[in-house]
Design a protein with these regions (language model features):
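N-terminal beta1-alpha1-beta2 submodule of the flavodoxin-like/Rossmannoid cofactor-binding fold
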Residues: 1-105, 112-116, 201-210
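A short, structured loop/turn motif at beta-sheet edges
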Residues: 33, 131-134, 173
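Residues at the starts of beta-strands that form the adenosine-phosphate
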Residues: 3, 37, 136-137, 176-177
């Protein structure tokens, strides 16, 4: 069975533009693919370990080929459990609001914890190889201001570290089939509603053939 993993990145549950667009995407996806399974991963409900102590020691033990202690092995198993949904899924949908030019710290925390050698990537003398190759991703980017629209008063190339980061990370772990859906000006009242409506329509169209 084809599985979709929806990673919900917004903590603003009632008013989130990224959640609204993702919900529209998923509704259209379900209609087009009724036999596919959709799983939701809300990073705000996810217990994640600090990457220190035993986990950090386990990382370097793995890099050096040293056997793990019992404590290190337990810490590493927790990391592998957090990464398991990404291996089990065939497709990903990310809802990513812009926070301080980048992504929410909870999403960054998850990425930092699970992006480990032999978990999401491998490397040898020829370079890095992502372990999620063959999967595809759709990413909904929500921004309060206009970063890509004509007349934007933000220098997008400098201020937008949201989309470049997500696409770099996805490619690093092997996901090269990436579709981006951008909803901007979410703080702009009526203008923001126009942008949100456009993004919802775009999401529905993309979802039908995703």
């Amino acid at each position: 069975m084809t599985r979709v993993l929806y990673i919900e990145g917004s903590s603003n549950k009632a008013y989130s533009a990224s959640i609204e667009v993702c919900d529209a995407f998923l509704d259209a996806y379900r209609q087009a693919h009724p036999d596919h399974e959709i799983r939701k991963l809300d990073i705000w409900d996810l217990a994640m370990p600090e990457f220190d102590g035993a986990a950090l020691a386990a990382k370097y033990a793995g890099l050096s080929g040293t056997a793990l202690t019992q404590e290190q092995a337990a810490a590493w198993q927790q990391i592998e459990r957090l990464a398991a949904p990404f291996h089990e899924a065939d497709k990903f949908l990310f809802g990513v609001p812009l926070w301080n030019f980048s992504i929410p710290y909870k999403l960054k925390h998850l990425i930092d914890v699970i992006s480990q050698k032999d978990v999401l990537f491998t490397f040898d003398g020829t370079g890095f190889t992502g372990k999620l190759a063959g999967k595809k991703a759709a990413v909904v980017y929500a921004r309060g201001l206009a970063y890509q629209s004509p007349g934007s008063f933000t220098p997008a190339a400098e201020f937008d570290l949201q989309r470049p980061y997500m696409e770099t990370w996805l490619k690093f772990v092997g996901v090269t089939d990436i579709t981006g859906i951008v909803v901007e000006r979410t703080l702009f009242g009526p203008d923001g509603k126009v942008d949100r409506s456009r993004a919802i329509d775009e999401a529905r169209t993309i979802a039908r053939t995703f």
